Amino acid sequence: TRPAIAPDSMTTLLDILAPSAVIVGLEGDTKDAIIEELVDRLEVGTAISDRDKVLQAVLEREKIMSTGIGDGIAIPHGKSDAVIELTAALGIHKRGVDFEALDGEPAFVFFLLVSPANVSGPHIKALARISRMLKNDGFKKKLIEAESSADIISAIEEEEKSHSSVG
């Protein structure tokens, strides 16, 4: 578990991403299976209060428009009153999964972000930060080639340091 953070105090992605929510080798082969696998890694009782409600919120958001943003990346996200605090899960799929991305290509990197229903600012800031970091091809390559969750956490720490002066 990790300490609770105030909604506006996220300073790095690791503030919202518990090591237990990092998956190297996602197993699902459909969009829904990937989302479910990621939601299952969120900490019930700490980050979320109801796994099924959170899963439903993310799947409903996905129906509106795919969060497969292209270039091998998907950022499924949602808001729910079953989310206690802004939280995330990150998964890598070595073979790639069709996520109905804008470019039609499979996604390999999946960053799930969920936040309380009544909070927008931190959710949008976190989405922007994730998106900015994943535009760095070197960083994305490190994630895809990671052998362990520790490799992913190290890559995030390194990337965060290189952007520490940018908010």
Model-derived segments and their meaning:
Residues T1-G167:
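Cytosolic covalent-transfer regions centered on His/Cys nucleophiles
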